Amino acid sequence: SPETIDLCLGYSNGLNAYIEDHGLIEDDIYPISGKDIIAGTMHKTPFFFQLPLFLGDLYFKKPSEIPPYYKRSDEIEKIKGSNVYALSPKITDKGNTILGINSHQPFEGELAWYEAHINSKEGWNMIGGLFPGSPVVLVGHNENLGWGHTVNRPDILDIYELEVNPNDENQYKFNGKWEDFESFEVIIKIKTIGKLKHKHKQMAYWSKHGPVIKGVNSTYAVRYSNMNNLLAIEQWYKMNKANNFKDWKNAIETLSVPMFNTGYADKEGNIYYVYGAKTPKRNTKYDWQKVLPGNTSETLWSEYELFENLPQVLNPESGFIQNCNSTPFQTTIGPENPSSENFNSNYGIETHMTNRALRAIETIGKDKKISYDEFINYKFDLNYSDNSIMAFLVKRAISILNENNKSEFDIDLKNQIINTLTKWNLSTERNNIYATLPIIAFNPLLDNSEDEIYDDLIIKRLVYASEYLLKHYNKIDVKWGDVNRIIRGDLNLPLDGGPDIARAIYYKEYKNGQKKAIAGDCYVLIANWNKNGKVSSQSIHQYG
């Protein structure tokens, strides 16, 4: 729309003014245009449905080696996660409506959140989180309503193997005929030393499906939802300016943003959840989790399922909704939960529950009257659920060690490990001396299902964790906060929380046996509408 174009132009003009005022002019990026802002959004969105990981593999791997999706152990996946909660007046002690927005992104870099409060005096009054380059707030609230997103994993990306003409590498077979690839030359600028850049010319190819990757083992094409849709910023802009649920829902129904779980609350006491997915209408005779044949129009989709057919929950009797990168089929408690039986398996909808989602159900879901302070405590909950993968791993490890007569550990160390695991109460409080060993051991396995975890792998991880702690601390019962650290400049402080905890912390190796927090609870905003509809909110950044 003209309004969105003006918005992007105004934002780019502001960036250019900043560049000029601060003497930061770089010929490669200056001047920034409104088109650059739109292109940036189109470039960043596919990061959330794993396109960069697929592209990296397509150059080298065979079709049978391409996974249907990537797990959190993969580097990009470690940074993605979020929690969103909404509580209606039915379960709050003062009849207020609470929205909890809790994004898990990197603490630093281009995908780190920053906060802005925009008040145009012309009907746009919004506060929340956004990424550098975004002209709109992506998660947050205005006077009347608010929302948060969490990353979901709908199947909105397909990979095709193309049959290339053995006599002409610039043709591929489609419906029995040889079709020419569209081709054009692109110039790629490669940074070398300092500000020096090398210009590399490369031919780019396109099939009826989308962009083509000529790999070592095969030639692939990629197709994903909204590949040519420029309207993501417009959708978010309309959500920013909406004054009521109807207007807001009209904006999100466009699905110009092709994914994300979204939790919503407003001053009228409405709460709402939707599993956002611009899901293609696909031929059910094919397995869409695998690489597809690109030689037939049967696999070439062009239409999408309707928004009204997505999993969603509006004003449940339980008075709350949550999503913590988990299945939409346990959004709340009670009969209003969507049923998996009503949705096509081609949608790729998740069925798993993260620990964060389990704990939300176990805390918020069991409390009939919740104060604001109690909600804050639930949001910063430090425990693994008894039904979590972590709890399963600990129980299984104890059982294996009690049954195992192998010599991975000497008898004293084996007994120490059993004692540590047995005494752990599943808390990640910083002074807990029993948490450190199992967290270091089992963190890489938390995205696995129980049937993917083998006894030998559990023992291997315990060997690693015990050797790590003995090397750096000369014992295995180390305070979790001595290892789990937040580091900023000269400050180096102990942290509560951990992987897949409501108070989420993800880390990397630092030094002297410490782990440096690099992602997790990076932006937390709690919006609170009182029973008269007046809003107040609190927010905090990862560094305070």
Please tell me what each predicted stretch does.
Residues 3-100, 105-106, 267-272, 278-281, ...:
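Acidic, low-complexity N-terminal propeptides/linkers enriched in Ser/Thr/Asp/Gly that mediate export
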Residues 77-79, 90-97, 101-112, 213-231, ...:
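Active-site-adjacent "gating/activation" loops or surface patches in catalytic cores
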Residues 234-260, 267, 340-396:
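Proteins synthesized as precursors that undergo proteolytic processing into mature forms
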